[in-house]
């Protein structure tokens, strides 16, 4: 416990230089245009009617808040000229965006400055490279096949937002900013049901996602920090086996001495008591713990995590959110794919002199499938098809030009193929392309009050080229013009693209 506290204090000490500017004493616009934020996201605020407000409006609002009489009136007389008026939706939405975006800009400054200072270093530490999403793809392709057990974790959200605010106290030395954050969260949301009642969440709207994303990332960063500590200390924790309390360090020392005289027994037994190498991968709100070794070690880690969230973050996590499965018999949802590692038999013919015989071996293969139900559900929600996948027209787009309609449908199709290009089976994607292509044809036919067959014949190859995906172009370049090439024949090929996070939200259904 003392080591845990010391490790935590060391972690806090690193962030003591993160002194946040006082929101009520400094002009935000001076920080918003700081050189450390030049490479980050734009600080412009987009309102509910698509009007853009610069950070200068944040400055004006803060100056207005400096006026003590106005602030007192807005609190003491909530129905008279108050700062956040629920009776006037525009002003409520407008001020909420300014305050949330302004606070997010302020708290992001130290992290941006830290990234800028790290970029000037000659060498980037290896563990920082492994934190990139790009490291997930080689892990799934190369190392995942050699593991045995999989723990699929749905990272829980804190039930009470006060937990998120308290986590910032470890890194924040600006108390007024914390009080302001509490005021903002309490004023704009139902404090006790912000996370549980998704439809009434005000902060999770698109206009306020920057602030909530910062709070969520702070929570995940704190959780992963302590998880790393538990992983480093796991080899030193005591182990209970057959009613005997064994100290791991001394036991392994004795086993090494015993293994000198009985090497065969040592190799078969020592793995049972030592923690194997564990791999941790996270994307958005889902994480994976995968490793080799005994099943009881995975159950031990499940118990660790349940107790960890209970005592470190003061809320109970349902054990069902941590699923423990054998990798060979499980299918898990990750990165928008349904992934599995099936074992398929492979017959190998061997020839020895005049005799030949067959040997059956089992090989593992990492299999990724684009989820048909969720993809069709997203298309149905966007009114491209029915719930059963039957294509329908898009009436709202009939006012656009023909080329705009073709471009929109083609771009959605290409983005879906681009995001799910890592799928080992493309049948679902071909079905999605068929839905979008026929929906586009019906939209054009509805616009011109004609039939689908007429427009298919009029546009011809131009209509098909709009749905010719980037992945098909890549594979077509691998073959010469004289070689017969059918993209359907290469349905098992996989290409991982690194820019999938910047694609439209439609390509990440229910994730």
UniProtKB/Swiss-Prot annotation:
Signal peptide (residue range): none
This protein's UniProt keywords: Chloroplast, mRNA processing, Plastid, RNA-binding, tRNA processing
One GO BP: mRNA processing
GO molecular function: RNA binding
Role noted for this protein: Usually encoded in the trnK tRNA gene intron. Probably assists in splicing its own and other chloroplast group II introns.
HAMAP family cross-referenced by the UniProt entry: MatK
Protein name (record): Maturase K
Organism from which the protein derives: Nardus stricta
């Amino acid at each position: 416990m003392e080591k845990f506290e010391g490790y935590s204090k060391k972690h806090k000490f690193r962030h003591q230089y993160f002194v946040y500017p006082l929101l009520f004493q400094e002009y935000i616009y001076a920080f918003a245009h700081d050189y450390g934020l030049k490479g980050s996201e734009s600080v412009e605020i987009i309102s509910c009617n698509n009007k853009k407000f610069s950070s200068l409006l944040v400055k004006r609002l803060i100056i207005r808040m400096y006026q003590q009489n106005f602030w007192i009136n807005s609190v003491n007389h909530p129905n008279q000229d108050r700062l956040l008026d629920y009776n006037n939706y525009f002003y409520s939405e407008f001020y909420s965006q300014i305050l949330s975006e302004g606070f997010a800009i302020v708290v992001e400054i130290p992290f941006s400055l830290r990234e800028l200072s790290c970029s000037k270093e000659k060498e980037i530490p290896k563990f920082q490279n492994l934190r990139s999403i790009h490291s997930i793809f080689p892990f799934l392709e190369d190392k995942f096949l050699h593991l045995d057990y999989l723990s699929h974790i749905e990272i829980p959200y804190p039930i009470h937002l006060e937990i998120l605010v308290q986590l910032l106290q470890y890194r924040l030395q600006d108390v007024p900013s914390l009080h302001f954050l509490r005021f903002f969260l309490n004023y704009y949301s139902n404090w006790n049901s912000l996370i549980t009642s998704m439809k009434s969440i005000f902060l999770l709207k698109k206009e306020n996602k920057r602030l909530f994303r910062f709070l969520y990332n702070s929570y995940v960063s704190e959780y992963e920090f302590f998880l790393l500590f538990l992983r480093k200390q796991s080899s030193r924790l005591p182990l209970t086996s057959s009613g005997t309390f064994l100290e791991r360090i001394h036991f392994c020392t004795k086993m090494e001495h015993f293994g000198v005289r009985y090497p065969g027994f040592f190799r078969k037994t020592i793995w049972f008591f030592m923690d194997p190498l564990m791999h941790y991968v996270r994307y958005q709100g889902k994480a994976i713990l995968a490793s080799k070794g005994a099943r009881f070690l995975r159950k031990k880690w499940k118990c660790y995590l349940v107790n960890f969230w209970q005592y470190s973050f003061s809320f109970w996590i349902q054990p069902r959110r941590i699923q423990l499965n054998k990798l060979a018999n499980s299918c898990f949802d990750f990165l928008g794919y349904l992934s599995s590692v099936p074992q398929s038999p492979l017959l190998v013919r061997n020839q020895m002199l005049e005799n030949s015989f067959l040997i059956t071996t089992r090989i593992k293969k990492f299999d990724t499938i684009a989820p048909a139900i969720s993809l069709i559900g997203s298309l149905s929600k966007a009114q491209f098809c029915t719930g059963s996948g039957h294509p329908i027209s898009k009436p709202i787009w009939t006012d656009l030009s023909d080329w705009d309609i073709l471009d929109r449908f083609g771009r959605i199709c290409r983005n879906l193929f681009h995001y799910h290009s890592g799928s080992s089976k493309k049948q679902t994607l071909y079905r999605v392309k068929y839905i979008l292509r026929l929906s586009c044809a019906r939209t054009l036919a509805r616009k011109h009050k004609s039939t689908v067959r007429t427009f298919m014949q009029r546009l011809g190859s131009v209509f098909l080229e709009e749905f010719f995906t980037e992945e098909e172009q890549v594979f077509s370049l691998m073959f010469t013009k004289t070689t017969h090439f059918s993209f359907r024949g290469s349905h098992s090929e996989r290409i991982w693209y690194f820019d999938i996070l910047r694609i439209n939200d439609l390509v990440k259904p229910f994730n």
